[in-house]
Amino acid sequence: MAKITSNTVSQLLSAVGGSSNVSKCGNCMTRLRLSLANNGLADQSVIKKIPGVMGVVESDEQFQIILGPGKAQQAAEMMNQLIDSLTSGDSEEPDMPQQDLSAVAAEQKKQMKSKQTSAVQRFLSKFATIFTPLIPGFIAAGLLLGFATLLEQMFVLDQTPSQFMLDLIAYMKVFGKGLFAFLSILIGYNAQQAFGGSGVNGAILASLFVLGYNPEATSGIYSGMNEFFGFAIDPRGNIIGVLLAAIIGAQVERKVRQYMPDDLDMILTSVITLLIMGAVTFLIIMPIGGELFKGMSWLFLNLNDNPLGAAILAGLFLISVVFGIHQGFVPVYFALMEAQGFNSLFPILAMAGGGQVGASMALYFKAKKDALLRTQVKGAIIPGLLGIGEPLIYGVTLPRVKPFVTACIGGAAGGFFIGLVSYLGLPVGLNTVFGPSGIVAIPLMTSENGIFPGMMVFVAGLLISYIVGFLATYFFGCKDVDLS
């Protein structure tokens, strides 16, 4: 695949309308996420021809360019540097097309027409900003925990292990314990920042959920208070409560800042915000967040244990990826981790990627030997097997529509199997909140009966997704489809 170079970034910037059209440049694991002043100035046909670009996703809030893992972050850093140099006058920017009045009118009409959808997409897109920086840590902690559990089951249980082995296992587990002990604080920081507030205020509010309020407790950090002016404190809600506190806290902070004199902003804005939000958190958010958290856990535990529900979740997941709203599942992952000790939704959703691989392989065998389609599949199938599905989605199946549908069917079949096994008494899941998909996720799988049953069920589900995705596409997804 093409590398991200300064020339690539320069071409991308020019194709989206220049630095003056880019309000914000960020990234997630695989996408360069741009907030454009006018989406009408971005030329998608030009962007798709730039080496390294796998596809484009456009919404009212963000213009997303799919580049692949690693490359998205590199491109975002280079583009921000280029924009800074252009705006400071260090370089000359190529001439950009003048903003057409009709284009502006069309853009405004589009935004007004889809205002509700845009609001939902804007809200869910914030989750990418909150959780994407944490994903490498989730993966690292999950892998270390997986290896530690593997060593434990092979060399410790029913044996007399050496002290070195015990120390090694404890050492590999400590990172996961550290991550989950203070994860709420990291999320609070990112969440309040994502919604327009100060990250440190979000971290402080999140710490209210981490502190202990029982002076007799022998673990945790006692907060120094066991009630709030006569009201009992029950730090429930976990991630849901933290997100609510940070989101509302950001709005309160912005309102306070509007009326605060500039000279007093640094001193008083955070003080007032914390005093208000502390009370709101103790009295309202913790009780409500706790009930929402409990309800979400119950809903998805029942869906995951239901073969039909699991099939629907897996079958629709690719569609949520296309619309960029799949990050909305992340709070559910936290709820399941709290309720079960592992993330039972993740392996179900991962089946969608298996269906994608199977569908793409069917297209490969249906296409002629010299077809460009075969080259496209060859370049995207390895990332697909490793859990990076976007090259297959945007480069192979989605442009041809029918194979995308049959890929969803393949994913639904794998999801049905995972749900059926769970219904029969063996729920499986990821040993961390978030992790890689595809075959890379195998070492991270676990179950109530240990890691080996979890790994075997996940592999069987993937194979079913591959096979059903392949057969559905081979026999039903290639008619009247461009295979050139």
Curated annotation (Swiss-Prot):
It is a multi-pass membrane protein. Residues 125-484 form the PTS EIIC type-1 domain. One of its GO terms (cellular component) is plasma membrane. The chain crosses the membrane at residues 127-147, 168-188, 194-214, 228-248, 266-286, 310-330, 345-365, 379-399, 409-429, 451-471. It is an enzyme of class 2 (transferase). CDD domains: PTS_IIB_glc. It catalyses: N-acetyl-beta-D-muramate(out) + N(pros)-phospho-L-histidyl-[protein] = N-acetyl-beta-D-muramate 6-phosphate(in) + L-histidyl-[protein]. GO terms for biological process: phosphoenolpyruvate-dependent sugar phosphotransferase system. One of its GO terms (molecular function) is protein-N(PI)-phosphohistidine-sugar phosphotransferase activity. It is found in: Cell inner membrane. Its EC number is 2.7.1.192. PANTHER family: PHOSPHOTRANSFERASE SYSTEM TRANSPORT PROTEIN, PTS SYSTEM N-ACETYLMURAMIC ACID-SPECIFIC EIIBC COMPONENT. The EIIB domain is phosphorylated by phospho-EIIA on a cysteinyl or histidyl residue, depending on the transported sugar. Then, it transfers the phosphoryl group to the sugar substrate concomitantly with the sugar uptake processed by the EIIC domain. This is PTS system N-acetylmuramic acid-specific EIIBC component. The gene is murP.
